[in-house]
Each structure stands twice: as structure tokens, then as C-alpha cells.
């Protein structure tokens, strides 16, 4: 097997059918401040598909887990996404604090989304945000640039809970590079969120 992780980026994945995608701490800034919104994230990718995902929030006794085709679980209890429509949903996002040249696009996207939803919030740990979406506590998610180790495990948890996530223009996610991620509890909500995001990216001529 091979390993693809934040600390070492790539450890011998060429030609490997089984690859572990690992983030030892998602939400590092929260962790250093003892804010519990941070997690260890481990995914197993097999032949280009994530088949197993585990997210372990730190400072708590929580475990989110999923195996492809077997559902998503929180501390051993099966979970599912909410049924909220777009206007009643809570959206999670980020403002690109690690690349502030992109922050204006993030703020403009948030400005366009906010009037159309119940609320828009930021946690600072993508894996936790996607898992809370899977658990039905939140309803949509958008982030302009994420690494595979940020979302691979939690993304499977979300999918197995009945949610959906894609890259730009509804393209499948590529687990080998940075990408935009749009996620939602329902396909129609993802489509609407994707349309808003795409309109802002087009205005800014954002091509990544």
C-alpha cells in the first residue's frame, strides 16, 4: 500500500492499488488553542475510489466512520443528512486564510449565498464540517481550495449518509490534487449552491 498525507504529501503511491490518505490534524489552529473543532482523518482509496473513512475529532469521544455501501456512523449509530431545503439550510465555508489572495472570492461568494439561506458559518476544520453535514446538523458546504487529506474520509462519511459532494462544474473529485469542494444534503441543494459559486468564479475569472 501507499500513503498520501499532509506531513509528507506523497509516500510511494505510484502503482499502488491501496492508498491511505491521512491528515494527522485537520484544524491545526484550533488544536493549538485547545478548540475541539479539529480531527484526525484517515481514508482508504482503492483503485481511485475512497472505500473507507474514519474521522476522530480531538478532545472528544466522537468517532465518525463509513465503509462504501455500508452506511455512515457516529459512535456506532447510523446517521443521515437533513431534509432541509435551500433557504432553511446552514452553510459552512472558509475564507482561504492560508492563501489570502483568494479571500476576496470567498467573501464575495459568502455575500451572495448568505441572503438565500438560514445562516452561514465557519469552523476551520473541513473534516468536522462535512461530518456534521452528514449527521444532519448542517446542510451545505463550500470551500475554494482543499487538499485530498482534508476531505477524503469525511467525504465518504457524507456520501454514505445520503449527501453529495463534487468539484467545480459538478466534476468528480480528484484525490491527487487541490480542488474546490461543494457539498450538500440533497442534489438539488448542491446544484443551487454550485450555480452561485460558479457565477462568482466566472466573474473573477478564477481558473483553478
Residue ranges of model-derived segments:
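An extended, acidic
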Residues: 81-208
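Conserved acidic residues
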Residues: 1, 17-19, 51, 89, ...
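N-terminal subdomain of lithium-sensitive/metallo-dependent phosphomonoesterases centered on the IMPase/IPPase/PAP
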Residues: 1-25, 203-208
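Acidic active-site catalytic centers that drive phospho-/nucleotidyl reactions
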Residues: 6-7, 23-26, 30, 129, ...
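Residue-level signal for inorganic ion chemistry
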Residues: 3, 28, 57, 66, ...
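DPxDG-like acidic metal-binding loop motif
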Residues: 14-73
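Solvent-exposed alpha-helices and their adjacent loops that cap or buttress functional pockets
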Residues: 11-14, 33, 47, 65, ...
Amino acid at each position: 500500500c501507499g500513503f498520501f498525507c499532509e506531513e509528507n504529501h506523497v509516500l510511494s503511491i505510484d502503482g499502488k492499488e491501496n492508498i491511505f490518505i491521512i491528515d494527522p490534524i485537520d484544524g491545526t489552529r484550533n488544536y493549538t488553542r485547545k478548540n475541539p473543532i479539529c480531527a484526525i482523518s484517515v481514508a482508504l482509496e482503492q483503485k481511485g475510489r475512497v472505500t473507507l473513512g474514519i474521522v476522530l475529532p480531538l478532545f472528544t469521544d466522537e468517532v465518525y466512520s463509513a465503509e462504501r455501501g455500508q452506511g455512515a456512523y457516529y459512535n456506532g449509530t447510523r446517521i443521515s443528512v437533513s431534509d432541509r431545503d435551500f433557504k432553511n439550510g446552514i452553510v459552512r465555508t472558509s475564507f482561504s486564510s492560508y492563501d489570502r489572495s483568494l479571500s476576496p472570492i470567498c467573501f464575495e461568494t459568502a455575500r451572495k449565498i448568505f441572503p438565500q439561506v438560514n445562516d452561514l458559518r465557519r469552523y476551520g476544520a473541513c473534516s468536522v464540517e462535512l461530518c456534521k453535514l452528514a449527521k444532519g446538523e448542517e446542510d451545505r458546504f463550500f470551500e475554494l481550495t482543499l487538499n485530498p487529506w482534508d476531505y477524503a474520509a469525511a467525504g465518504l462519511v457524507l456520501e454514505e449518509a445520503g449527501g453529495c459532494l463534487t468539484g467545480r462544474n459538478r466534476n468528480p473529485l480528484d484525490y491527487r490534487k487541490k480542488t474546490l469542494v461543494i457539498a450538500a444534503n440533497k442534489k438539488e441543494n448542491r446544484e443551487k449552491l454550485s450555480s452561485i459559486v460558479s457565477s462568482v468564479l466566472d466573474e473573477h475569472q478564477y481558473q483553478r
